[in-house]
A protein has these predicted regions:
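Sequence signature of WD/YWTD-type beta-propeller architectures
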Residues: 31-34, 38-342
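N-terminal intrinsically disordered, acidic low-complexity segments at the extreme N-terminus
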Residues: 1-6
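N-terminal Sec-pathway targeting helices
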Residues: 9-30
Length: 342
């Protein structure tokens, strides 16, 4: 037995010496595959950004194309497809009154406001499929073959094939954001807004902060939120941009946001916050400010009081009235240049 083990050892050693280069290459390939597998399993694919979805999800993108909700004489005309660069033809893919656009794989998902349905269709608009009924007009998000959506104020999830419908919470959730393997959400409790988190099954609930704002977003390892206070002396609301760690620690004010902020329009990128607020003569304007609280910049004035701000790459899409006084989607660079109607 001992001699057999010695012979086996010698055989392995001799094979390694004779094929050292091949063995090292094979080990390197295996190592790369293992690393790729680990990284790949940790990457989440989102159908749209959280900031866009909390602004009606008017625009979603895939590759060099955008899909957006179009208006005709102030009424929703359907969902259209166009090139990001603004060149080439514009194609109508659906006449549906749909919002909260998500794109995952070769499918587009949205909420039909007329029928309160969650719809899935191919990117060319064909083969519509109803995934869920009694869906609220509120943000949906498609993440890794799951769709998160509201029925009333209750949060649910369902597979993209329409199976495994699961209720995640019975709380009256105001806002939610799926981040990796967790869901961050806000709800009202005793007149104050709580920010909490749970896992993707609705379990392991943890309160993060019990006096934060309704409007929040997770960016990197921080939670940003708007602290809204009523000034009794001046009879007006005051707004603060605040931040804290994802565990609720190190809460601090970043800056004041002056003026009548429309908190429902808040959108964000990795380094900036976007929002609409009142300016003089009862008009509104869309602004940006860096997440460190510096360089507030007015991007564009708008005629509509209620707005929705969507961002794709370096472009911002928003609602405004055209010369006839009808609501329409406009596109402008985030630096305020190249403003035009879609």
């Amino acid at each position: 037995m001992k001699e057999k083990l010695i012979n086996l050892k010698n055989t392995v050693v001799n094979f390694y010496k004779a094929n050292k280069k091949i063995v090292l290459i094979a080990l390197a390939v295996i190592l790369v595959l293992i690393i790729a597998l680990i990284i790949g399993t940790g990457k989440e694919e989102y159908g749209n950004t959280y900031g866009n979805l909390r602004n009606k999800g008017l625009v979603a993108s895939k590759g060099s194309q955008i899909y957006y909700v179009a208006f005709d004489e102030g009424n929703v005309d359907g969902i259209y497809k166009a090139n990001k660069n603004g060149k080439g033809k514009v194609e109508k893919i659906s006449s549906e009154y749909g919002y909260y656009l998500n794109i995952s794989g070769n499918y587009i998902y949205y909420v039909s406001e007329e029928n309160s349905q969650l719809i899935k269709s191919k990117l060319n608009g064909e083969k519509n499929q109803v995934i869920a009924e009694n869906v609220s007009s509120a943000p949906i998000v498609v993440v890794n073959n799951w769709i998160y959506y509201f029925e009333g104020t209750n949060l649910y999830k369902i597979k993209t094939n329409g199976k495994n419908r699961t209720q995640l919470s019975n709380k009256a959730i105001e806002n939610y954001q799926v981040v990796g393997k967790e869901i961050y959400y806000s709800y009202e409790s005793n007149g104050k807004y709580v920010i909490a988190k749970m896992n993707l099954s609705g379990r392991d609930i943890t309160k993060i902060d019990e006096e934060a704002g309704r409007e929040f977003f997770v960016n990197g390892n921080k939670i940003y939120f708007i602290n809204e206070k009523y000034d009794m002396e001046n009879y007006e609301y005051k707004y603060e941009l605040c931040k804290m760690k994802k565990n609720g620690k190190n809460k601090e004010k970043v800056c004041d946001i002056e003026g009548g902020l429309d908190t429902y329009t808040i959108n964000f990128t990795n380094d900036a916050l976007y929002y609409a607020k009142a300016v003089k003569d009862e008009k509104m304007a869309i602004y940006s400010i860096k997440l460190n609280g510096k360089d507030e910049t007015k991007i564009v004035e708008v005629s509509t009081y209620s707005n929705a701000i969507n961002i794709v790459d370096k472009f911002m899409y928003y609602l405004n009235e055209n010369e006839e006084g009808n609501v329409q989607v406009y596109r402008i660079r985030t630096n305020g240049q190249d403003n035009k109607a879609m």
